[in-house]
A protein has these predicted regions:
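Glycine-rich phosphate-binding loops of nucleotide-dependent enzymes
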Residues: 2-249
Length: 249
């Protein structure tokens, strides 16, 4: 049986600034695992470290073998990330952006993956020749997820895909994420909408100040008084302006 993603004692940061300290985390194969936490907790830093975008220490394995720190080698192992900034090509069409995600595939397989992406995202199919830069934020987010799927990832990492979206679009996007999971893709989801993320996940981790403070079955955490109290506290911190610096979420 595949071992999925296993993280032990992960340390990461930016230069002399340490953001993550001793992170232990698992994303079992075939499961949808969510990581939540307040602003500045280190959630985005976690995904950047796992994607090889910043140096990391500790042990990270995928399917039982060490995960390299080189982004290209990580992609070749079957991992894909959708960053918070989407990183689309605004002057290229929806179809062209999607096809870039499958540039390593043979032409026939790339066409099949494109058709599959349009099945998941019918709105993209309707706008396949529209320029990405003219789309709404929600449509661009769907395009970013669709492009990541083009490479046939075995593990899909999503960095706050619902950030800045209207509630209806959040529901639509997370429903698609759940469909992708049901299609057999292992997912590690970093999400700022705690209740909605826990509602679609199997496992969950709560990160605060660069450390895992809670973990368990998502349903159990969803009903946890401790989690609700922690997030009430996190909201107060953000409102009073004493939260950690942005960019290390």
């Amino acid at each position: 049986m595949s071992a999925g993603l296993l993280v032990r004692g992960l340390n990461a940061g930016y230069g002399a600034i340490r953001v993550l300290e001793g992170i232990d985390l698992e994303a079992p194969p075939g499961e949808l695992t969510v990581v939540v936490g307040p602003n500045g907790a280190g959630k985005t830093t976690l995904l950047r470290a796992l994607s090889g975008l910043i140096p990391r220490g500790g042990e990270v394995t995928f399917d039982g073998a060490p995960l390299p720190e080189n982004p290209a080698a990580i992609v070749s192992r079957g991992l894909a990330q959708v960053p918070e900034g989407r990183q689309l090509f605004p002057h290229m069409s929806v179809r062209e952006n999607l096809e870039l995600g499958g540039y390593l595939l043979a032409r026939g397989e790339r066409a099949a993956r494109l058709a599959r992406a349009f099945e998941f995202f019918p709105k993209l199919a309707e706008r396949r020749e529209q320029l990405a830069g003219t789309m709404s934020g929600g449509e661009q987010q769907m395009l970013a997820v669709g492009r990541a799927l083009m490479g046939k990832p075995r593990l899909l990492m999503l960095d706050e895909p619902s950030l800045g979206l209207a509630p209806k679009m959040v529901d639509e996007l997370l429903a698609i994420v759940r469909r992708i999971h049901d299609d057999g893709v292992t997912i590690l989801l970093v999400e700022q909408n705690v209740a909605k993320a826990l509602a679609i996940a199997q496992g969950a981790f709560v990160i605060e100040r660069g450390a895992v403070v809670m973990k368990g079955a998502a349903g159990n955490l969803l009903n946890s008084e401790q989690l609700r109290a922690a997030y009430l506290g996190a909201t107060v911190v953000r409102q009073t302006g004493r939260n950690s610096p942005s960019g290390s979420g």
